[in-house]
Amino acid sequence: MLENRVKTKQIFIGGVAIGGDAPISTQSMTFSKTADIESTKNQIDRLKLAGADLVRVAVSNEKDALALKELKRVSPLPLIADIHFHYKFALIAAQSVDAIRINPGNIGSKDKIKAVVDACKEKNIPIRIGVNAGSLEKQFDQKYGPTPKGMVESALYNAKLLEDLDFTDFKISLKASDVIRTIEAYRMLRPLVIYPFHLGVTEAGNLFSSSIKSAMALGGLLMEGIGDTMRVSITGELENEIKVARAILRHSGRLKEGINLISCPTCGRIEANLVDMASKVEKRLSHIKTPLDISVMGCVVNALGEAKHADMAIAFGNRSGLIIKEGKVIHKLAEKDLFETFVIEVENLAKEREKSLKD
């Protein structure tokens, strides 16, 4: 685990701590109509199962806002109301949810912001100042355009508004749709405020595009110690947002959990259907939370070397293969018997590690 994380003010969204020494949380956003409580609840359940810590829902009209009371009652995750344009929906939402997200570029005048702050104070819930490069306030857009500087100036202006209202339970996000502006904006703002940061690349695209952009932008920031909560925005299945987010946390040294799959890129030496085997291993072992390095290699050329550094490895030969545990060969089996035996051995190793931690 990296030790260079920037320590920020800690806030709470429901029972989830954001900032300070708290783990970096992951979140997603439902795509159902929020007033459709059954559909929205089903999506929240899916996110909970995928490992999300928080969930955000769109509040597009009064019907959505009024549905939040019941949705909060049935939600297994802390609930964040996402408000654009209509501050009165935030006033209704504040009576039920765990946090409010506002976009300073479209929420309205200082008086409207004050009304939202007063409602959040009354219920003791935090606010996210959600700055987007594509919807900056007119004065910042005209002066700076959709640049990191414009985003930072907007964030500072709105942070000062909240501070002047004696409200400091907030976090900040600075989202652009590309890697460079996103990184530059967060880097620029970090030394200027103590508040926690919500990381994200907005409108990042489909699974492939978003995974690349998010890994570069969010992973880069996380390795610099920047970031307290995050969302990977993907045009696609909800669960993928959490899966990719947690992978970024693991590989940036911010989360020690689960399987780290090591597999070779294939070449003419492979002795099995390695692509299929690596996919099967990853899927079957996805439930394991114990941090383990697992190697799946198509031949013995690199397998033995990799196995020295892996917790468990499988190496294919000619219609057979080796299972290697902590650098030692424990099985030589026919290819048809390798997969199930390997899965059992990995699961047993995970149990051993968990038991040793408890002891």
UniProtKB/Swiss-Prot annotation:
Record EC number: 1.17.7.3
Q: To which pathway does this protein belong?
A: Isoprenoid biosynthesis; isopentenyl diphosphate biosynthesis via DXP pathway; isopentenyl diphosphate from 1-deoxy-D-xylulose 5-phosphate: step 5/6
Judging by the UniProt lineage, the source's domain of life is: Bacteria
Name the needed cofactors: [4Fe-4S] cluster
Q: How is the cofactor bound?
A: Binds 1 [4Fe-4S] cluster.
GO BP annotations, alphabetical order: isopentenyl diphosphate biosynthetic process, methylerythritol 4-phosphate pathway; terpenoid biosynthetic process
EC top class, in one word?
Answer: oxidoreductase
Catalytic reactions of this protein: (2E)-4-hydroxy-3-methylbut-2-enyl diphosphate + oxidized [flavodoxin] + H2O + 2 H(+) = 2-C-methyl-D-erythritol 2,4-cyclic diphosphate + reduced [flavodoxin]
Gene Ontology terms, MF aspect: 4 iron, 4 sulfur cluster binding; 4-hydroxy-3-methylbut-2-en-1-yl diphosphate synthase activity (ferredoxin); 4-hydroxy-3-methylbut-2-enyl-diphosphate synthase activity (flavodoxin); iron ion binding
Pfam families of this UniProt entry? GcpE (PF04551)
Q: Which UniProt keywords apply?
A: 4Fe-4S, Iron, Iron-sulfur, Isoprene biosynthesis, Metal-binding, Oxidoreductase
Question: Which residues are listed for [4Fe-4S] cluster binding in this entry?
Answer: 264, 267, 299, 306
The free-text function statement in the UniProt record for this protein reads: Converts 2C-methyl-D-erythritol 2,4-cyclodiphosphate (ME-2,4cPP) into 1-hydroxy-2-methyl-2-(E)-butenyl 4-diphosphate.
Family assignment?
Belongs to the IspG family.
HAMAP family in UniProt: IspG
Q: What is this protein called?
A: 4-hydroxy-3-methylbut-2-en-1-yl diphosphate synthase (flavodoxin)
Q: What's the source species for this entry?
A: Helicobacter pylori (strain Shi470)
